[in-house]
Amino acid sequence: MEVMNLMEQPIKVTEWQQTYTYDSGIHSGANTCVPSVSSKGIMEEDEACGRQYTLKKTTTYTQGVPPSQGDLEYQMSTTARAKRVREAMCPGVSGEDSSLLLATQVEGQATNLQRLAEPSQLLKSAIVHLINYQDDAELATRALPELTKLLNDEDPVVVTKAAMIVNQLSKKEASRRALMGSPQLVAAVVRTMQNTSDLDTARCTTSILHNLSHHREGLLAIFKSGGIPALVRMLSSPVESVLFYAITTLHNLLLYQEGAKMAVRLADGLQKMVPLLNKNNPKFLAITTDCLQLLAYGNQESKLIILANGGPQALVQIMRNYSYEKLLWTTSRVLKVLSVCPSNKPAIVEAGGMQALGKHLTSNSPRLVQNCLWTLRNLSDVATKQEGLESVLKILVNQLSVDDVNVLTCATGTLSNLTCNNSKNKTLVTQNSGVEALIHAILRAGDKDDITEPAVCALRHLTSRHPEAEMAQNSVRLNYGIPAIVKLLNQPNQWPLVKATIGLIRNLALCPANHAPLQEAAVIPRLVQLLVKAHQDAQRHVAAGTQQPYTDGVRMEEIVEGCTGALHILARDPMNRMEIFRLNTIPLFVQLLYSSVENIQRVAAGVLCELAQDKEAADAIDAEGASAPLMELLHSRNEGTATYAAAVLFRISEDKNPDYRKRVSVELTNSLFKHDPAAWEAAQSMIPINEPYGDDMDATYRPMYSSDVPLDPLEMHMDMDGDYPIDTYSDGLRPPYPTADHMLA
């Protein structure tokens, strides 16, 4: 009986609205009942209006009530209700006073009647909703046991009809809350959805759960009833509406229900969701991709499942083929999460992810641009050999002119990695004013190491080993970058930044025109100061027998190597050579010849080779007892080290007695020059040896500047997995409980 009443319920609202004017004169501008000066007349008016409303209403709700008793109760309640409605909507207005509301309407101005009508209309609407809310809740509560029974019926037709009724109830808030309060009914809906083969029943049951998922209580009821595995099964449905209801319900569960993510993973939800990326509805794809992001965020296993099911390729395809901003944004969020996974990164890059993301760097959507920038930044260390990135590189150079910290961090980091060991990219960036843009970025960055360090690394790459390297070295000077770069050597800058700056200074010193401005910027005293500090720190650990620790990811031995190598190149200039000598550095350089690190031995021998060109310095080198370690280095496996050692020995032996010179000559001939006449000639004539620093990294020790070193993925603004502050669907926070089409706007 209650179920039948549910079908008649909408009639009540319409009829109440149609007869509502009898309770108020606002609609017609006059009372619908004739005013009376007697109290009896007024009472009769109330009763007449009330009876008219009561007569209509009781056709739905008084079935089964004895006529005499039911009529009396309903007349009393509705009479009082009509009176309350009138008093609430038009307080203080009697039948006689209502005629005063009539006024002549002036064109362009609201009449008194119209102004009075505005609040009354709002109140009327509120009353309609209130009556509906109460009656919906009561009817739904009474019908729940019967509906639960019908949903469990063996007759599919009965089950379908019951599902349709419950679906109608779930569309109204009051009855929906009643449904959520019945675990038995929700469980019956889940069972029906899971077991049915009827498409209409599947559509109704998924729609019911979708409607319930707009409330926290509904989400909990679905979760406790085992709804998640059932919803995951529905992702295989051929019916588009069923797919939509299932994915949006799962999306709401993932957003707001604790434990839902694990439940979806255990139900193999990812394996069902990734193939859905081949659908062609942009709004459906937007919800699906956000589900993937919620599941992959902070969960390495989920990322690998997405990879195994072809997720990177499908996501890149979406970025390449669609223009719907919300879809591009949600897809870029998934790619950003995957971009810190070592296994997913190559797959994204190989699928053309760098190029697809680069397409959107000029989008009008700031949030999309920022996601693409972070993802490019995180992928760039495995994309150093990628082709077709010319437009991306040009856009990144242009992005260096903006003031947004995140944009600058991403642009500098990506440029640093993409110019690593890639001569073509280095040349392209240099030719497109990349050096100038990077210097300006450094000047604006201030103390923001996240910008300054990758910018310096990019400049270090641009100033070495490509056809336009000399142009880049000169460009730094011409754009007044040298003073700013030298200042970065000051403590308390982080050691990674100091290390990158030392390497850049070494490259700048390869250009003779830069020597004077470098000297004016007092670069040599700063390098010597850093060298002494780093060497002392390293020696303390050697003396204590402890392993050299990393400071911010940098070993002090790397700083020693870098400073010595930079001083080696600077010493080619006579003025610089004299300044280095006067700072009493020779004893330290001689000590470095005993280092266990081959690269340090090489740069130490190199700087001594340059200093030995001056007799005073050569004598000082000899006085420090350098001959013994230099003799040993003649047998070094590193050809450059052996050549430098030979040149120093040859120079300091010039003023020795004939016996000493003969012994040195024999040693040189036996160890090095027997098979290398060119090296012998170089040692004799003291021609500076321009051996390039190799690209290969030592197996146990990473050289300071011997190669371009790609930056690791940033542990910020990417996946908090390392990262990142939770992005949301709006520019502010997520809406608490989205409406049915919150993703479809």
Swiss-Prot record:
Transmembrane segments: none annotated. InterPro entries: ARM-like, ARM-type_fold, Armadillo, Beta-catenin. Expressed in the heart (at protein level). Keywords: Acetylation, Cardiomyopathy, Cell adhesion, Cell junction, Cell membrane, Cytoplasm, Cytoskeleton, Disease variant, Glycoprotein, Membrane, Nucleus, Palmoplantar keratoderma, Phosphoprotein, Repeat. GO terms for biological process: bundle of His cell-Purkinje myocyte adhesion involved in cell communication; canonical Wnt signaling pathway; cell migration; cell-cell adhesion; cellular response to indole-3-methanol; desmosome assembly; detection of mechanical stimulus; endothelial cell-cell adhesion. GO terms for molecular function: alpha-catenin binding; cadherin binding; cell adhesion molecule binding; cell adhesive protein binding involved in bundle of His cell-Purkinje myocyte communication; cytoskeletal protein-membrane anchor activity; nuclear receptor binding; protein homodimerization activity; protein phosphatase binding. It is found in: Cell junction, Adherens junction; Cell junction, Desmosome; Cytoplasm, Cytoskeleton; Cell membrane. Changing residue 24 to A: Does not affect glycosylation. It comes from the Eukaryota. The modification Phosphoserine is found at residues 99, 125, 182, 665, 730. It is a peripheral membrane protein. The modification N-acetylmethionine is found at residue 1. Residues 574-661 are annotated as: Interaction with DSC1. May be phosphorylated by FER. GO terms for cellular component: adherens junction; catenin complex; cell-cell junction; cornified envelope; cytoplasm; cytoplasmic side of plasma membrane; cytoskeleton; cytosol. Pfam families: Arm. The entire ARM repeats region mediates binding to CDH1/E-cadherin. The N-terminus and first three ARM repeats are sufficient for binding to DSG1. The N-terminus and first ARM repeat are sufficient for association with CTNNA1. DSC1 association requires both ends of the ARM repeat region. Homodimer. Component of an E-cadherin/catenin adhesion complex composed of at least E-cadherin/CDH1 and gamma-catenin/JUP, and possibly alpha-catenin/CTNNA1; the complex is located to adherens junctions. The stable association of CTNNA1 is controversial as CTNNA1 was shown not to bind to F-actin when assembled in the complex. Interacts with MUC1. Interacts with CAV1. Interacts with PTPRJ. Interacts with DSG1. Interacts with DSC1 and DSC2. Interacts with PKP2. Interacts with PKP3 (via N-terminus); the interaction is required for PKP3 localization to desmosome cell-cell junctions. This is Junction plakoglobin. It comes from Homo sapiens (Human).
